[in-house]
């Protein structure tokens, strides 16, 4: 047997508020920017959309948890040759490889390494056939010259960066558009208030500041002076 309260609820025409049928995967409309909203794919995640548009979801370097890209094939070479792993000729092959590597190391000339082609802050280690360090060549190539202009440095940075997408170009053009500055218009009540102050005190802004009846919002002397200057220019008052 139900209680009186339950019977009243059942007879009531007001429906029960329930979130059971609420769509949790509700489509969130992008209204911040018309270009992003036009190119936004609602079937992708935020990070996937940003990558597709050529933007960054996080400014800092990601610490992990990135989505794996299955379209790129990464080939890894085996450390041990599977054919000769259990064969009889494995020892002879390894000896030939070691002799070839020794010949390559011995044939490497120090003069072939140009220190001006190595970036500043890096070095190349030259070893002999036994693996001992013969010489360390430090780089002298400067990434940015101090004497270069800002335009030259920007051009170098632009060359190093990857090619921008069409969406990024549209966003840059949208951001660099000329914006007309909208000046503030004084309201009718503000004009009436300034007129009363001028008729009562003239150009005595200090008296306007200490007027308790008119300056009820305790505006400073400088604020009243700026508003009064604008009001005078609009009404052609010297």
Swiss-Prot record:
<protein>
    <recommendedName>
        <fullName>Nucleolar protein 16</fullName>
    </recommendedName>
</protein>
<dbReference type="GO" id="GO:0005730">
    <property type="term" value="C:nucleolus"/>
</dbReference>
<comment type="function">
    <text>Involved in the biogenesis of the 60S ribosomal subunit.</text>
</comment>
<feature type="region of interest" description="Disordered">
    <location>
        <begin position="1"/>
        <end position="26"/>
    </location>
</feature>
<keyword id="KW-0539">Nucleus</keyword>
<comment type="subunit">
    <text>Component of the pre-66S ribosomal particle.</text>
</comment>
<feature type="region of interest" description="Disordered">
    <location>
        <begin position="80"/>
        <end position="122"/>
    </location>
</feature>
<dbReference type="GO" id="GO:0006364">
    <property type="term" value="P:rRNA processing"/>
</dbReference>
<keyword id="KW-0690">Ribosome biogenesis</keyword>
<comment type="similarity">
    <text>Belongs to the NOP16 family.</text>
</comment>
<keyword id="KW-0698">rRNA processing</keyword>
<feature type="compositionally biased region" description="Acidic residues">
    <location>
        <begin position="88"/>
        <end position="120"/>
    </location>
</feature>
<keyword id="KW-0687">Ribonucleoprotein</keyword>
<dbReference type="Pfam" id="PF09420">
    <property type="entry name" value="Nop16"/>
</dbReference>
<dbReference type="GO" id="GO:0030687">
    <property type="term" value="C:preribosome, large subunit precursor"/>
</dbReference>
<dbReference type="GO" id="GO:0042273">
    <property type="term" value="P:ribosomal large subunit biogenesis"/>
</dbReference>
<dbReference type="InterPro" id="IPR019002">
    <property type="entry name" value="Ribosome_biogenesis_Nop16"/>
</dbReference>
């Amino acid at each position: 047997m139900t209680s009186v309260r339950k019977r009243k609820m059942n007879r009531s025409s007001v429906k029960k508020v329930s979130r059971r049928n609420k769509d949790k995967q509700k489509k969130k409309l992008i209204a911040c920017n018309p270009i992003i909203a036009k190119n936004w794919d609602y079937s992708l995640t935020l990070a996937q959309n940003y990558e597709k548009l050529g933007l960054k979801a996080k400014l800092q370097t990601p610490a992990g948890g990135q989505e794996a890209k299955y379209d790129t094939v990464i080939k890894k070479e085996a450390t041990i040759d599977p054919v000769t792993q259990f064969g009889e000729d494995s020892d002879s092959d390894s000896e030939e490889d070691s002799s070839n590597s020794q010949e390559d190391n011995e044939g490497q000339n120090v003069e072939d390494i140009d220190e001006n082609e190595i970036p500043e802050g890096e070095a190349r280690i030259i070893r002999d056939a036994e693996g001992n360090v013969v010489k360390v060549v430090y780089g002298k190539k400067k990434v940015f010259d101090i004497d270069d202009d800002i335009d030259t440095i920007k051009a170098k940075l632009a060359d190093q960066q990857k090619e921008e997408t069409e969406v990024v170009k549209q966003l840059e053009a949208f951001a660099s558009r000329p914006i007309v500055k909208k000046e503030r218009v004084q309201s009718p009540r503000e004009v009436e208030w300034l007129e009363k102050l001028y008729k009562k005190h003239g150009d005595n802004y200090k008296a306007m500041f200490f007027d308790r009846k008119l300056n009820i919002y305790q505006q400073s002397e400088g604020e009243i002076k700026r508003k009064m200057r604008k009001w005078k220019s609009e009404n052609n008052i010297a």
